[in-house]
């Protein structure tokens, strides 16, 4: 398993912020599919998915903007700081399942 630092931009009521997550997956395809699943399910009522990298909701807009494979030491440092949410991806790229370090499903936390 490898860990990526994934970045998303979130616009909410005219304010844009960057959100980063640590994504642990078997390969880049699985990691990217997990980020796309996060974007699709950020809030409950998806209005529009644009090019599989931008999602529009009544509450705001989410963009997938970066993914970087981390070296082991980088992963260790970022996890040690404890300020980023860490997700482990299982399942197939067309149906990824994301769980945090306590076993909570992404869909249960965001809804």
Regions found by a protein language model. Give the residues of each.
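Short, mixed-charge low-complexity intrinsically disordered segments
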Residues: 37-111
